[in-house]
């Protein structure tokens, strides 16, 4: 097994543990990650942290495996084709990149998250990067295109022009630049990303989850909609959460809890 799950109450940390290969992704690891994240999505856990053991988040697709995809094995990639219709697609080349989970994932990024590893980082809801970590489309050098959602998620985060520049040059994008342009949400000292991601996960998990997940879903689903359509979606998604938890929360505030922005006693 190259994937481990550590459970701390409502927080799961899903660890890719293949440090001898800089956590490059082969089919075995890809399948194990899909199983782990599907298990998380079905569980009572509220937030997952995605971490690469050994100082590297993920160095991308395992090119030692990729070089074998010729001759009798050339059809293996076809097994990952999207199906006709709306049925669930097979896993991505790097595993969970095609999963649309119902709960948030925080990426804890140490060292390189490059090529397909960058695509996995972009799949996460939130990214916490070490100050010496970096992203980059390093597969540019080897003639391998982005296949795990990079061309979809990158421009949504940084805009089309910056996405094209990063993708076509294949250059290194260091943590501080990632923070500045919206590719990560927090930069922390090296060696502390998992710790800081788990702290953030616990902050998210302690809130009433109907509203947290409703707002997450509305933010994700409203992309591409007009303002009116987006606000209608927000209302449809959110009104039940108000009935389930919001009324009770308002009553607690009226009784004195959480005044003046105090989050300690909620």
PLM feature spans:
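Conserved CoA-thioester-binding segment of acyl-CoA-metabolizing enzymes
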Residues: 1-55, 67-71
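Terminal peptide-recognition signature
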Residues: 14, 18, 32-33, 50, ...
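Short, active-site-adjacent cap segments at secondary-structure transitions
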Residues: 55-59, 114, 136, 219
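Hydrophobic alpha-helical membrane-association signature
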Residues: 29-32, 193, 234
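C-terminal alpha-helix plus adjacent terminal tail
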Residues: 1-9, 57, 75, 170-176, ...
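Crotonase-fold acyl-CoA enzyme core
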Residues: 96-210
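Short beta->alpha linker loops
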Residues: 28, 52, 61, 170, ...
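An acidic, glycine-rich surface segment that forms the CoA-thioester-binding/catalytic face
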Residues: 30-34, 42, 63-110, 152, ...
């Amino acid at each position: 097994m190259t994937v481990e799950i550590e459970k701390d109450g409502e927080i799961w940390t899903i660890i890719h543990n293949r440090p001898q290969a800089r956590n490059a992704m082969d089919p075995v690891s890809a399948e194990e990650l899909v199983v782990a994240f599907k298990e998380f999505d079905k569980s009572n856990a509220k937030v997952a942290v995605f971490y690469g053991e050994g100082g590297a988040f993920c160095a991308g697709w395992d090119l030692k495996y990729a070089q074998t995809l010729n001759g009798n094995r050339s059809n293996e990639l076809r097994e990952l084709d999207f199906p006709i219709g709306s049925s669930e697609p097979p896993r991505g080349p790097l595993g969970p990149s095609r999963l649309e989970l119902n709960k948030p994932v925080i990426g804890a990024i140490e060292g390189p998250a490059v090529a397909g590893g960058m695509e996995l980082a972009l799949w996460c809801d939130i990214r916490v990067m070490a100050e010496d970590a970096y992203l980059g489309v390093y597969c540019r050098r080897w003639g391998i295109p982005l296949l795990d959602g990079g061309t979809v998620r990158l421009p949504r985060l940084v805009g089309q022009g910056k996405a094209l520049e990063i993708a076509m040059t294949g250059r290194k994008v260091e943590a501080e630049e990632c923070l500045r342009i919206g590719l990560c949400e927090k930069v922390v000292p090296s060696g502390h990303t998992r710790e800081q991601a788990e702290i953030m996960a616990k902050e998210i998990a302690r809130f009433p989850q109907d509203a947290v997940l409703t707002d997450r879903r509305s933010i994700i689903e409203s992309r591409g909609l007009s303002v009116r359509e987006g606000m209608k979606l927000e209302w449809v998604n959110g009104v039940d959460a108000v009935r389930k938890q919001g009324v009770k929360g308002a009553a607690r505030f009226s009784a004195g809890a959480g005044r003046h922005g105090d989050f300690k006693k909620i």
